[in-house]
From Swiss-Prot:
Tagged with keyword Metal-binding: yes
Similarity section: Belongs to the PanB family.
The name this protein goes by in its record: 3-methyl-2-oxobutanoate hydroxymethyltransferase
Superkingdom of source: Bacteria
InterPro entries: Pantoate_hydroxy_MeTrfase (IPR003700), Pyrv/PenolPyrv_kinase-like_dom (IPR015813), Pyrv_kinase-like_dom_sf (IPR040442)
EC number(s) recorded for this UniProt protein: 2.1.2.11
Compartments in which it is found: Cytoplasm
Binding site for Mg(2+): D45, D84, E115
Name of the gene: panB
Class in the EC hierarchy, top level: transferase
Pathway(s) the chain acts in: Cofactor biosynthesis; (R)-pantothenate biosynthesis; (R)-pantoate from 3-methyl-2-oxobutanoate: step 1/2
Example GO BP: pantothenate biosynthetic process
Cofactor(s) named in the record: Mg(2+)
Length: 266
């Protein structure tokens, strides 16, 4: 049984209880998260970068997303799972876009997330919500628009940009989103948005005042020693710990210490 549902997001904001979200892509790590206190899981299109080594999220497809959602849902059947709508999957005709939503939901998602709040997106979100499917919005640094934004940069610094982000957040709430991700926006702006809309905000690089926080699992575990954006706290030195385990294995194999005849052999 899933421990969390969409009304819980609203309740937690009302009760001033922070929401924890982790981005996860595979079965084995989902199994670990399923035993943790983390509230919910995002299967993000960032898997194109983290799992496949691409430089952007754009190569993620609906089918790739569905496969990873299936794996995560099998590993963490007790967690609320959000599936990312990948690049351009919701910018096509309504039937094609809804087929993409259907694929992700049938793969095991309980909600979908999509980036931006232009007129096209708002109309589509309205249709999806009216179809009984929960939607999370995503504002600020929207990686699918990376070439338009000019890189991975903080958004909303200028007054006009901040005003637009506020208007977009209000529009997403009014259209029926049950939460919105705020990525790489000034903390004061994120706080103002959080207090100005009825739905929870989930921050990544958006300061402490948002309704919750999301980090990629591999990032918070510190598995990439080359990746250190300002917003990231590494809760584990995973790179060094994993490397040491591999080196210890290598040494024990080469010195015939492993496998031990009495302990590891049949």
């Amino acid at each position: 049984m899933i421990a969390m549902n969409t009304p819980d997001f609203q309740r937690m904001k009302k009760d001033n209880k922070k929401i924890s979200m982790v981005t996860c892509y595979d079965y084995w790590s989902a199994c670990i998260i399923s035993q943790s206190n983390v509230d919910c899981i995002l299967v993000g299109d960032s898997l194109a970068m983290v799992m496949y080594g691409h430089s952007t999220t754009l190569p993620a497809t609906v089918e790739i997303m569905a496969q990873h959602i299936q794996a995560v849902s099998r590993g963490a059947p007790n967690k609320f799972i959000i599936g990312d709508m990948p690049f351009c999957s919701y910018r096509k005709d309504l039937t094609t876009s809804m087929n993409a939503v259907e694929r992700l939901m049938q793969a095991g998602a309980q909600a979908i997330k999509l980036e931006g709040a232009d007129a096209h997106n708002l109309k589509f979100i309205h249709h999806v919500v009216k179809s009984g499917i929960p939607v999370i919005g995503h504002l600020g640094l929207t990686p699918q628009s990376i070439y338009t934004l000019g890189g991975f940069k903080v958004q909303g610094k200028e007054p006009s940009a901040a005003k637009k982000l506020m208007a977009d957040a209000k529009a997403l709430a009014e259209t029926g989103c049950f939460a919105v991700v705020l990525e790489c926006v000034p903390s004061e702006l994120a706080e103002l948005i959080t207090h100005s809309i009825s739905i929870p905000t989930i921050g990544i690089g958006a300061g402490p005042a948002t309704s919750g926080q999301v980090l990629v699992l591999q990032d918070l575990l510190g598995t990439n020693n080359q990746f250190q954006p300002k917003y990231l706290k590494k809760f584990l030195n995973g790179f060094e710990l994993i490397k040491k385990a591999l080196d210890d294995f290598d040494q024990e194999v080469k010195t015939s210490t492993y496998p031990h005849l009495e302990t590891h052999c049949y």
